[in-house]
Amino acid sequence: MKKKGNRGLIWSFVVIFLVLLFDQILKIWVKTSMTLGQEIPVIGNWFKLLFIENNGMAFGWLGGGGFLKLALSIFRIVAIIALFWILVRLSKKNTKFGVLFGIALITAGAMGNIIDSVFYGRIFSESTYTQIATLFPDGGGYAGWLHGQVVDMLYFPIIDVARENATWLPDFFFGPDGHFIFFRPIFNFADAAITVGVFYMLIFQWKWLKTLN
């Protein structure tokens, strides 16, 4: 039984490693290949790489700098430690891998963004609208430890309707640019891992979640 639990934990670490690997490769490529705000179409106008940076949580929520940024980074680190502790505890109880898989996705996503926050300010020069960032610049990075910006790039404006073409829609549907866009948020692979992990747990592991009550 212990061997089964160890196998589940090992596969959870494999999931975390693969998510982190893809997330960081994509972020480093974007950071060293694109200027801030640059857009690269991938699938027509439905899927684009659009490079932005933010201080906040998934999808750019709760953005901010200074103390808020530091507090958010520390909170992420504490949350990751807690998630790893949960993974180890559950694996020792021979919890089914489906549960471990969902938690591993969430853990990997949280780790992907904390890597940006902790290290990117030290190892990259600043990205601007006219200049591509350099990895390990001679003059040092653009910010201190725990103050790096999170790199976002995945953009899916599947529906893009101008206000004049949808006058029947209420005004609050339209952004400052006068367009109703779905899906407007720009995010990264780590954000996607967190979101998929949460929905996976709610949809496919709800019976296990009920046992926590």
Question: Predicted segments — roles?
Answer:
Residues M1-N213:
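Alpha-helical transmembrane bundles and membrane-interface segments of multipass inner-membrane proteins
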